[in-house]
Amino acid sequence: MKAVILESYVMEEGDLDWSGVKALVPDITSYVRTDYADIAPRIGDAELVLINKCRIDETVLAQCPNLKWVGIIATGTDNIDLEACRRHGVAVANVPGYSTYSVAQMTFSLLLAICQCAQRYDRAVKDGYWQLGIPAEYGLLPQVELLGKTFGIYGYGSIGRQTARIAKAFGMEVLVCTRTVRPAYAADGVEFVDFDTLLARSDVLSLHCPATQATRGLMSREALAKMKPGAILLNTARGALVDEEAVADALESGKLAFYGADAFATEPLPPQSRLRGLPGAVLTPHIAWTTKEALQRLMDITTGNLRSFLAGKGENIVNP
C-alpha cells in the first residue's frame, strides 16, 4: 500500500519521529504542512493518509478514488466529513484519550494563572520593583482562593472527568452538565445539573465537549448573560463553542472577570481579535495537547491504528 503524511510537523518534536509508521508502510511520502488546495493532489493514488487539521470532504474524496483509510493525528473530527467518508468506503480512525491529563492540566494552568497573577508578579520581582513597592502598572491584583468555589463543567468525557478530580482536590464544589449520566459517575462526588443551573451557579465554568451542531455557539451572548457576575470562563476544548465577540463584551463590561482559552474560532488568533487587547483574557496557542508525554501517546496510538487497519481489524474507527 501507498501512504501520505500531510502534516508531519505535528510529530517531529524532540525524540519523536515517524519510524514506526514508515516501518509499516515503506512506500510513504511526507509533507511538513499542506494547504487545502494541495490535499487531493498530494494524496493522489494513495490508499492511506495521515492528517492533523487538513480537511477531508466530498471534494477531496472525489479526487482520491484509491483512498481507504484516514488516520487523524488527534481526537477531534471537526475537519472530517465522516458521512462522505462512509459513502466513499473510507475508514476514519482517531486517537482518543491521549491528551486527557495534559488538557486537564492546562485547564488548571489557565485558572491558576488567573487566580494567582503569577506572571505579573514574576515580572515585578525581575524588574526590581519588589524593593520599591509594586507600582500601579503592575497592580496589586487580588488573588483568589479556589477552596469552596463552585467549578462548573460542560461535557463529562475523559477530560471533563479528570478536570473534576483536580477541582475536587482544590476543595471546590463541582457541577456537571452532560448529555448522558452514567452509573459509574455516582462515585465521583459531583452534582449533575442542567445548563441554566450550571451557568447560574458556577464561579468557574470550564468547557470540555466537542464542537457539534448542538454545541457550536454554546457560550452565546444569551448564555453569558445567565452567568454569575464576575465569573471565570475557561475553554480548552474547541473555539467554535464560544461567541468570542460576546465574550469580549462580557469582559469589558465586567460580567466576566476572566476568560482563559487555549482554543479559538480562528487559529492562529487573528490580529484584529479583541481578545488580544483585553487584560482579562489569558490566552495560549492551542498547546494543551503538546506535552512530551501526550505526544508520545499520540504517536504510539496513531501507529497502532495503522497497524490494526493493515491487519484488517480497524481500531478506533469513528465512522463504522
Regions found by a protein language model. Name each.
Residues 1-46, 175:
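N-terminal glycine-/charge-rich "phosphate-binding" loop or analogous flexible N-terminal tail
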Residues 32, 73-74, 90-101, 178, ...:
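Short beta->alpha connector loops at strand-helix junctions that form conserved
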Residues 58-61, 179-274:
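Rossmann-like adenosine-cofactor binding region
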Residues 88, 96-150:
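Phosphate-binding beta-alpha-beta segment of Rossmann-like dinucleotide-binding domains, i.e.
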Residues 156-157:
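Glycine-rich Rossmann-fold phosphate-binding loop(s) that bind the pyrophosphate
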Residues 160-161:
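N-terminal Rossmann-fold NAD(P) dinucleotide-binding loop
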Residues 297-298, 303-320:
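NAD(P)-dependent dehydrogenase/reductase Rossmann-like domain
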